[in-house]
């Protein structure tokens, strides 16, 4: 049996210590994993504590060597070739606070595999003081769909007619809602289709969880991220996808559509194509095929 793990759960202190020990660099900002002490005098006790914990977990050898698989995953997360930043927000609790989950899908290109052959990607998800690293083979945008929905409420796709709004109009609507304008009045102002009104109202007035996704790449030593991101929103009326596109005049437009797995895969493909390195999965493009429809 292959004893190489494909996932590990660490404290954020464990993760920071491993990254420093192996020289992996810093973690992406989205994970918010930073130096756990502010006084150099605290370092000795911190290092001893981490070594004890990782040794008990079987991740640190008596010679002080970090488990090679875990070390490789952390290197991928700290210095990916391509990535998706994930910021999840859950329904507000009784005290008004929202549950927050942070994550990143980190991909390596070139050979297509990490050195321990567990996959070409690593998914890191942080919840409070714990962070989970999972090695995965990701070679198709459709493989990303269940990953992106992991922190959501797993609602079925909402049923409504797709519609689009200029991003600036949506931003203006948000401002009006925050200033106290009734939701119904704002929905009228936006001219939202009748079939979509209950869904839009559930987004703003009911319990919801959502993930905001931004893509990035490292090409020729330069880090680039997309100007805009896409969102997947789970509401009492179902799952809604909010995806960006650029109009002919250069203005960004947000399209609201039922959050089907296919639609999400297409949106991921479109978002990542905005980056300098183009299509992430050129051999696995997903698109609507109207060729078999009768005229």
UniProtKB/Swiss-Prot annotation:
Keywords: Chaperone, Cytoplasm. InterPro entries: EspG. GO terms for cellular component: cytoplasm. It is found in: Cytoplasm. Interacts specifically with ESX-3-dependent PE/PPE proteins. Belongs to the EspG family. Specific chaperone for cognate PE/PPE proteins. Plays an important role in preventing aggregation of PE/PPE dimers. This is ESX-3 secretion-associated protein EspG3.
């Amino acid at each position: 049996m292959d004893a190489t793990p494909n996932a590990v759960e660490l404290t954020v202190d464990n993760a920071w210590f491993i990254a420093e020990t192996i020289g992996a660099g810093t973690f992406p900002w989205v994970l918010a994993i930073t130096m756990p002490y502010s006084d150099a005098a605290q370092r000795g006790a911190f290092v001893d504590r981490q070594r004890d914990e990782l040794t008990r977990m079987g991740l640190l050898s008596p010679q002080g060597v970090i488990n090679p698989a875990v070390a490789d995953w952390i290197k991928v997360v700290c210095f990916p070739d391509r990535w998706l930043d994930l910021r999840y927000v859950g329904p507000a609790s009784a005290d008004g606070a929202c549950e927050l989950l942070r994550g990143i899908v980190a991909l390596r290109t070139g050979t297509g595999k990490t050195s321990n052959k567990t996959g070409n990607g690593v998914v890191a998800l942080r919840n409070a003081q714990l962070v989970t690293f999972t090695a995965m083979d990701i070679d198709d945008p459709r493989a990303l769909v269940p990953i992106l929905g992991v922190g959501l409420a797993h609602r079925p796709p909402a049923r409504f007619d797709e519609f689009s709004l200029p991003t600036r109009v949506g931003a203006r609507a948000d401002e009006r809602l925050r200033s106290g304008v009734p939701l119904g009045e704002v929905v009228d102002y936006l001219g939202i289709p009748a079939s979509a009104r209950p869904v839009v109202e559930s987004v703003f007035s009911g319990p919801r969880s959502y993930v905001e996704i931004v893509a990035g790449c490292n090409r020729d030593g330069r880090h680039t991220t997309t100007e805009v991101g896409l969102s997947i929103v789970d509401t009492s009326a179902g799952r809604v996808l909010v995806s960006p596109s650029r109009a002919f005049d250069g203005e960004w437009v947000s399209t609201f559509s039922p959050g089907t797995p296919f639609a999400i895969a297409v949106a991921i493909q479109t978002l990542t194509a905005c980056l300098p390195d183009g299509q992430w999965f050129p051999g696995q493009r997903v698109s609507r095929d109207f060729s078999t429809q009768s005229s």
